[in-house]
Amino acid sequence: LEVVNIVARPDIARQQGVRTVPWMRLGDFELEGLHSPAELRQWAERAGSDAGLVEYYTDLFKHGRLPKALAAIRKYPGHIPALLALAEDPDTELTVRIGVSAVMEDAAGSALLQNQMSALINLARHTDPRVRSDACHFLALTRDQAAIAVLENLTQDPEPAVQAVARDSLEELREYLPT
């Protein structure tokens, strides 16, 4: 544990992107504001686990900290599976689903999303139509030719809402691909 007086060392605060105090890092988690010893212990236990990442991003999205989530994904691209786990869970709250979508939109056309193609295809096969709809959108955001066949199949989904999102996503994807 390293404690830094940011009045004496503002350079360290700038380097770490600290804008509020207290601020701390536990593993990949950056925590702001006051936390009880029990909360800090809980976050320390979560650090380094997949379930902990899911909780971390859920907390960020629920508290309107999208910029922090975007910065974290840019810094730790290996966290993207935690967001896909949130997208895969039909019980994920709407505010969290919106946050996940915003991060995916920010990563549109990037290798970060393209490297998740197999996971996105699995989401497209999910039993829940909301998850399949989100998968359609995410597949279009990959800007990857391989997403076309998956989206074409989803235009025949038994759920009309999924069909509509698949058609829109297919149209969006084709706009970005070279002809």
Question: Regions from the language model: what does each represent?
Answer:
Residues L1-I12, V18:
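Thiol-based oxidoreductase modules, predominantly thioredoxin-like and allied folds used
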Residues D91-E93, T127-D128, P158-E159:
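Short inter-helical turns and helix N-cap capping residues of alpha-solenoid HEAT/ARM repeat scaffolds
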Residues L53-V54, Y76-D89, S110-R125, D144-Q156, ...:
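Amphipathic alpha-helical scaffolding segments comprising HEAT/armadillo-like alpha-solenoid repeats
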Residues A13-G27:
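Structural micro-motif
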Residues R25-Y56:
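Non-catalytic, surface beta->alpha helical segment in thiol-disulfide oxidoreductase systems
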Residues L70, S101-M104, R132-H137, E152, ...:
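Hydrophobic core positions within HEAT/HEAT-like alpha-solenoid repeats
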